[in-house]
């Protein structure tokens, strides 16, 4: 093997150089995102002048084999919503064959009578005809007209199918309603009291609204700390920049608002993608719709074990790959638009670079400090620049994370404890471990799997937190 004078194998130097060039690319991508403006809903803006002009909001609650106590915690938060009762509905949408969840919901409606239940039947049921007829007439529902599943009514029995059925039922039931809007959340999502008010303000300016999320059980385990940190990094920091009209946007899958007329006109939800979030956002962006960010955060729970975290993340990764392939062509994205759409995924996908860069960085540092460094000068300069850039970015991220921990942790000692769990060394190891869900998700994409709802188990992890926060504040403090 060819070596430099110091005896360092040339292949290691080249690998180190590649890793540093990739790190520079990641930094430049980060700078691009930071150059994009964040379009936030200004809660100081006025509401519509009269109650009749407020959006009529139908909150959809898709559930599958959920714990009754998890749903009860969510309903506790929904009971605190500060919005005229005549201007919203809360509709749980279990599958019709999920008898255990339906029984739990029926018991809970005795305590929370504002909750309605809409059972989602099998797609052979004639009540689905409203969907098929709408898709027949709408070329925006390209999956129905083109591809290997064109015309297939055998939709996979997961969250997206529930949302599709409920969307068209809501549109049919409330044809006479002005400003008809849907919002949907996950089984464990607990919105703040001003969630609907934020929508009423924001929908006067934006077409789609997305609330931020914060994990409440971030101190439950080391795995939970890392999973919550992923949300701190993406949901709490980078995501808001996707609201710049220049950048194709995704949605986060809960705590978001669509105008029903827009969603119907654009074909509803794509049933054949593992997660619906990226594709529907891309479709809205391509059709000129704008995104606004609601800074008041939903409380959610994150997986408390690494196994559950991998299951969740591989599903995300598969959906990202799926949404960035054929759908972009079907939606007539130009090459430049496709590149920008891929940029949304690159911060996640680039985590694999750490599995190469971190060990090589340790090796290069060791050689340097032992006085046996033969790296080219340009590579030394690039490495120093990357270290400085990385340090600056991490300081900013940790400052942001410290601020957001205050949304759910009252005691300073708890906040410090969390920051210690997500210290830079542990985070580096975690980012290396991301190679596992990235690989598994890519395999899912290649196999066209992910059609079955691979659930992330919800364990009512935020029971006490949600009740104390809602009782104390009625609404979470905003994080700007």
Language-model segment annotations:
Residues 94-108, 121-129:
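A conserved acidic beta->alpha catalytic loop
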Residues 1-76:
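N-proximal low-complexity "stem/linker" segments adjacent to membrane-targeting elements
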Residues 175-190:
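Short beta-strand-to-loop acidic/aromatic patch adjacent to the donor-nucleotide binding site
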Residues 56-58, 89, 279:
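Cell-envelope/extracellular polymer assembly enzymes that use nucleotide-activated donors
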Residues 282-299:
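Catalytic donor-sugar/metal-binding loop of nucleotide-sugar-dependent glycosyltransferases
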């Amino acid at each position: 093997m060819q070596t430099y004078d110091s005896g360092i194998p040339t292949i290691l130097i080249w690998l180190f150089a590649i890793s540093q060039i990739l790190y520079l690319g990641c930094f430049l991508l980060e700078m691009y995102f930071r150059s994009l403006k964040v379009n936030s809903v200004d809660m100081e803006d006025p509401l519509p002048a009269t109650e009749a002009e407020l959006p009529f909001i139908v909150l959809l609650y898709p559930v599958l084999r959920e714990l009754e106590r998890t749903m009860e915690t969510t309903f506790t938060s929904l009971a605190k919503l500060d919005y005229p009762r005549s201007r919203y509905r809360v509709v749980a949408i279990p599958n019709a064959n999920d008898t255990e969840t339906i029984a739990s919901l029926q018991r809970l409606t005795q305590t929370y009578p504002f909750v309605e239940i809409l059972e989602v039947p099998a797609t052979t049921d004639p009540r689905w005809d409203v969907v098929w007829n709408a898709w027949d007439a709408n070329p925006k529902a390209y999956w129905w007209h083109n591809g290997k599943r064109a015309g297939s009514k055998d939709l996979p029995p997961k969250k997206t199918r529930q949302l599709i059925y409920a969307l068209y039922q809501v549109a049919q039931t409330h044809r006479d309603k002005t400003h008809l809007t849907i919002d949907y959340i996950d089984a464990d999502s607990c919105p703040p009291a001003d969630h609907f008010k934020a929508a009423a303000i924001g929908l006067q300016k934006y077409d789609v609204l997305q609330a931020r999320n914060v994990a409440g059980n971030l101190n439950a385990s080391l795995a939970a700390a890392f999973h919550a940190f992923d949300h701190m990094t993406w949901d709490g920091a980078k995501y808001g920049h996707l609201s710049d009209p220049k950048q194709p946007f995704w949605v986060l899958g809960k705590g978001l608002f669509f105008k029903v007329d827009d969603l119907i006109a654009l074909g509803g939800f794509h049933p054949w993608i593992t997660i619906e979030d990226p594709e529907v956002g891309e479709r809205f962006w391509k059709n000129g719709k704008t995104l606004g960010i609601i800074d008041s955060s939903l409380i959610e729970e994150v997986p408390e074990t690494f196994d559950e975290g991998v299951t969740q993340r591989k599903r995300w990764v598969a959906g990202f790959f799926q949404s960035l392939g054929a759908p972009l062509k079907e939606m007539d994205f130009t090459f430049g638009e496709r590149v920008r759409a891929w940029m949304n995924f690159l911060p996640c996908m680039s985590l694999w670079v750490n599995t190469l860069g971190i060990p090589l960085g340790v090796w290069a540092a060791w050689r340097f400090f032992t006085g046996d460094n033969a790296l080219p000068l340009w590579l030394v300069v690039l490495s120093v620049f990357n270290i400085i850039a990385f340090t600056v970015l991490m300081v900013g991220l940790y400052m942001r994370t410290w601020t957001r921990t205050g949304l759910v942790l009252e005691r300073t000692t708890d906040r410090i404890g969390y920051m210690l769990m997500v210290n830079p060394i542990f985070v580096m190891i975690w980012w290396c471990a991301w190679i596992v869900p990235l690989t598994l998700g890519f395999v899912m994409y290649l196999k066209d799997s992910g059609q079955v709802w691979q659930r992330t188990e919800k364990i009512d992890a935020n029971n006490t937190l949600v009740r104390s926060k809602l009782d104390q504040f009625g609404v979470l403090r905003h994080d700007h």
